[in-house]
Amino acid sequence: MKLIAANRKLFENIKIKYCIIAIFSSAFLAFGLYQVHSFSGVTEGGVLGMTLLLQHWFNISPAISGFVMNSICYLSGWKLLGREFMVYSLISTLGFSGSYRFFEQFEPLWPQLYEMPLLAAIVGAVFVGIGAGLCVRIGGAPSGDDALAMSISKLIHKEIQWVYLFTDLVVLGLSVSYIPLQRLGYSLLTVVLSGQIVGVLQRKKC
């Protein structure tokens, strides 16, 4: 009986509407990361950028590396962010990993984006900003850097987009190992734009 009561308490405030948003927004994010960032040479920061770095150097699918790194970040911050956050984040993470695995089966739709890094940076930022932003807005996170950014933002009382910028810059620094220097400027543009979009969406209510 105690176990049943605990499960009811865990899910009593969970909204079906938010679960649906978590699934579709994480799929939107996965589509953009695969179709734009993984083929354009314009990377993301945070855990998303780390998944691309691991894919490049060790051929580890972001569907796997993303799930592992996200789980570590979530377990580190669940006490601060609460039970509802964990439920929505689990749905978002599974949605992202499953969607990315599905999209990996197909050829890129826009391979020409490699020759248009500015457009890739802008389009990629829209996919990442909206996908991650909608998840953050409902109180969840599709990736570990979102969970980490939400935790740090709450602790230091700073707007989330500036926390994103700091963590993204760290990953971009590591990405110098496989991304040409001239493309890092476009990567910086995409992380700044996506972070601002997340910040705007976070302030809105569903």
Label each residue range with its predicted role.
Residues 2-206:
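Core subunits and conserved enzymes of cellular information-processing
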